[in-house]
């Protein structure tokens, strides 16, 4: 990377650094990821995330290493309903594999680099297990499920600037040890800790479509369809399938976003988190929500949504007739038939510019990521129209747009028609984002 590109990357990443600081991320590291040649670089990137003020919980699995030990000991893995059946001998090998990985991960995270502080990595009894029991006549023996998560203990460690490390073996209240599916642990930890993100890795750059191209965004129902395809191909144990199941569950429980990245590509974690378009697959939003182009039937709901903001002077007043004429310009988020957010895209073809206008989010959802979802969709629509610059006029949300890569501009920077009709009495701030800039 040339020095100018490096400077540009740092500048573009700044909004994301600010956005992620203080948030809690749960990172899933399965056995394949840990065994990959690129794992040492992933560890370095995790250390970087911690240095940027992100609270990190690492949940690791050991399926690859466990199966390797079983094979070396001439023991055939046994599964029932995609869950490993763990007898006493198998549990000893599970503990051996998990214990070694726990030590290796902790050692690599704790490795001190020149002029950098020593990281505090904590691995303790943060979870308690209980036996799965018998299902359809099959005794799972020492395979377990979560009984309790020590949420306050984990929070305290995060507040003390520690990285929390959790493995797939946990004790029970009776003193026995149980083998847990690590994706179940990661799922429940993310939900109970109210994490901002769940991050996983696989041998592909996210979920691929039928042409082998990475899918940038998925809704839960779309993710469920892809998960079913993995199951039908008898690939439930793949990294992709296990991540999809976890991501669907956490998204429906309130975790804002989940990301699946390649463990083979160096820097994929940083590219996903600190560039505009990312590199892997992101799953977000609840299944009850739909983002779509507005229709005439949506006009009453749109008026109801934007009217309070017009009364406050935040939005310019729009008549019903004007909405009817421009309805196809509006992108809306529909939640169970209720419009909870909207934004319009006004295109100026000659200048290859477009305006994101009439941005409104229902008060009950303003603390969520709906604004980000709208912005991403408007960007996508603009790019599909070969728009090079996206601009906004705002009186109240300058910082919000600046945090997402927009830069202050002047009236002279607007398209001619918009410039000629600029309301100097309203004194709206003008912000512009270049859609043609590289994302790294």
From Swiss-Prot:
Q: Which GO terms describe its molecular function?
A: L-glutamate N-acetyltransferase activity
Enzyme class, first EC level, given as a word = transferase
Keyword presence, Amino-acid biosynthesis: yes
Any Gene Ontology CC annotation: cytoplasm
Keywords per UniProt: Acyltransferase, Amino-acid biosynthesis, Arginine biosynthesis, Cytoplasm, Transferase
Q: Please name the pathway.
A: Amino-acid biosynthesis; L-arginine biosynthesis; N(2)-acetyl-L-ornithine from L-glutamate: step 1/4
Superkingdom, natural source: Bacteria
Q: A biological process (GO) annotation for this entry?
A: L-arginine biosynthetic process
Which Enzyme Commission number(s) are on file for it? 2.3.1.1
Database matches in InterPro entries = AceGlu_kinase-like_sf (IPR036393), Acyl_CoA_acyltransferase (IPR016181), Asp/Glu/Uridylate_kinase (IPR001048), GNAT_dom (IPR000182), NAGS_kin (IPR033719), NH2A_AcTrfase (IPR010167)
Name the HAMAP family on file: N_acetyl_glu_synth
Q: What else is known?
A: In bacteria which possess the bifunctional enzyme ornithine acetyltransferase/N-acetylglutamate synthase (ArgJ), ArgA fulfills an anaplerotic role.
Q: What is this protein called?
A: Amino-acid acetyltransferase
């Amino acid at each position: 990377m040339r020095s100018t590109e490096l400077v540009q990357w740092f500048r573009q990443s700044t909004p994301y650094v600010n956005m992620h600081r203080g948030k809690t991320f749960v990172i899933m590291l399965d056995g394949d990821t840990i065994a990959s040649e690129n794992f040492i670089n992933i560890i370095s990137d995790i250390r970087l995330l911690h240095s940027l003020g992100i609270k990190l919980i690492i949940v690791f699995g050991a399926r690859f290493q466990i199966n390797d030990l079983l094979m070396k000991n001439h023991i055939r893995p046994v599964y029932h309903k995609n869950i490993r059946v763990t007898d006493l001998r198998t549990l000893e090998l599970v503990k051996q594999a998990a214990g070694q990985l726990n030590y290796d991960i902790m050692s690599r995270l704790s490795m001190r680099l020149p002029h950098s502080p020593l990281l505090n990595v904590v691995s303790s009894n943060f979870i308690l297990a209980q036996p799965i029991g018998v299902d359809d006549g099959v005794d799972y023996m020492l395979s377990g499920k979560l009984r309790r998560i020590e949420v306050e203990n984990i929070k305290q460690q995060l507040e003390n600037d520690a990285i929390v490390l959790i493995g797939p073996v946990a004790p029970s209240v009776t003193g026995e040890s149980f083998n847990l599916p690590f994706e179940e642990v990661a799922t429940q930890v993310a939900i109970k800790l109210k994490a901002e993100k769940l991050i996983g890795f696989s041998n592909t750059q996210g979920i691929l479509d039928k042409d082998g191209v990475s899918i940038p965004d998925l809704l839960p129902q779309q993710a469920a369809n892809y998960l079913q395809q993995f199951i039908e191909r008898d690939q439930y144990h793949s990294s992709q399938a296990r991540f999809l199941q976890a991501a669907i569950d956490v998204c429906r429980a309130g975790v804002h976003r989940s990301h699946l990245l390649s463990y083979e590509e160096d820097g994929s974690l940083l590219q996903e988190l600190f560039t505009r378009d990312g590199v892997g697959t992101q799953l977000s939003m609840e299944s009850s929500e739909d983002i779509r182009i507005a229709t005439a039937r949506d006009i009453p709901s749109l008026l109801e949504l934007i009217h309070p903001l017009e009364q406050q002077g935040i939005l310019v007043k729009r008549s019903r007739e004007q909405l009817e004429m421009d309805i196809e310009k509006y992108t809306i988020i529909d939640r169970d038939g209720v419009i909870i957010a909207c934004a319009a895209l006004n295109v100026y073809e000659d200048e290859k510019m477009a305006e994101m206008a009439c941005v409104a989010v229902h008060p009950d959802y303003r603390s969520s990521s709906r604004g980000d979802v709208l912005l991403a969709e408007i960007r996508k629509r603009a790019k599909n129209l070969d728009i090079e610059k996206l601009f906004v006029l705002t009186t109240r949300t300058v910082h919000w747009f600046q945090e997402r890569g927009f830069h202050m501009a002047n009236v002279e920077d607007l398209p001619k028609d918009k410039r000629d009709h600029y309301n100097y009495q309203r004194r709206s701030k003008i912000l512009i984002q270049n859609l043609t800039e590289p994302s790294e």
